[in-house]
Amino acid sequence: MKNDVISPEFDENGRPLRRIRSFVRRQGRLTKGQEHALENYWPVMGVEFSEDMLDFPALFGREAPVTLEIGFGMGASLVAMAKDRPEQDFLGIEVHSPGVGACLASAHEEGLNNLRVMCHDAVEVLHKMIPDNSLRMVQLFFPDPWHKARHNKRRIVQVPFAELVKSKLQLGGVFHMATDWEPYAEHMLEVMSSIDGYKNLSESNDYVPRPASRPVTKFEQRGHRLGHGVWDLMFERVK
């Protein structure tokens, strides 16, 4: 599933405008398993949107590094990462309820207690609920590239959004992006390189090899079989 959980239009103060969104709410049909997960596991792992800042130690019951993933699709890679790194905490945001249900079901099956999920617009969550300087990592994997030129403004990686992400990262925190659309990778690189306070972690100052910490998704595997490339970008907050 494409990741498309952002409304990237901002006013002069960096606040999200509501006119244009980069996602359409395509809720789709819930399977019985997804419906069961939403009914039974959301009360434990789900986080309702509010205008109060989250207290991560209270939310997870401990002090630990927090990774935020924006647009986790069906949640397979997010659950895999949370399982592989029990010493870290993970918060995922996804607007499509079938994906949220699938993620909850998988997390419950794995017995995870270091994963929480939200079903809301990610920009609003970042503005209203994520404290500044609180995140170890922000992950944005395979966002909708909006191929047509007239739709490029819908791309979520724009300067105001990247600045917003930077404000939520701790010093030394990392914004990790991945895309299978080379023009979007070039756009991401241009945007991120223009912002003071980010350092590109690529030795060649462009893209990084896929880190072992990012699982290969089914979507990505299919792309590899078709000969499609994937570009990973990792930028560290340095000030």
Curated annotation (Swiss-Prot):
> Known InterPro entries for this protein?
SAM-dependent_MTases_sf (IPR029063), tRNA_(Gua-N-7)_MeTrfase_Trmb (IPR003358), tRNA_methyltr_TrmB_bact (IPR055361)
What residue spans carry the region label Interaction with RNA?
Answer: 150-155
**GO molecular function annotation:** tRNA (guanine(46)-N7)-methyltransferase activity
SUPFAM superfamilies hit by this protein? S-adenosyl-L-methionine-dependent methyltransferases
Q: What is catalyzed by this enzyme?
A: guanosine(46) in tRNA + S-adenosyl-L-methionine = N(7)-methylguanosine(46) in tRNA + S-adenosyl-L-homocysteine
Query: Annotated pathway, please?
Result: tRNA modification; N(7)-methylguanine-tRNA biosynthesis
Which key words tag this protein in UniProt?
Methyltransferase, S-adenosyl-L-methionine, Transferase, tRNA processing
Active site residues per record: D144
Q: Which residues bind S-adenosyl-L-methionine?
A: E69, E94, D121, D144
Query: Which PROSITE patterns does the record cross-reference, listed alphabetically?
Result: SAM_MT_TRMB
| Cystines in this chain | none
Q: GO CC annotations?
A: tRNA methyltransferase complex
In its keyword annotation, does this UniProt entry include Methyltransferase? Answer: yes
Keyword S-adenosyl-L-methionine among record annotations: yes
Q: What EC number is given for this enzyme? A: 2.1.1.33
So where does substrate get bound? K148, D180, T217, K218, F219, E220
Q: What does the annotation say about its assembly with partners?
A: Monomer.
Q: What does this protein do?
A: Catalyzes the formation of N(7)-methylguanine at position 46 (m7G46) in tRNA.
Supply the HAMAP family for this chain.
tRNA_methyltr_TrmB
Q: Which family does it belong to?
A: Belongs to the class I-like SAM-binding methyltransferase superfamily. TrmB family.
This protein is called tRNA (guanine-N(7)-)-methyltransferase
Q: Which gene codes for it?
A: trmB
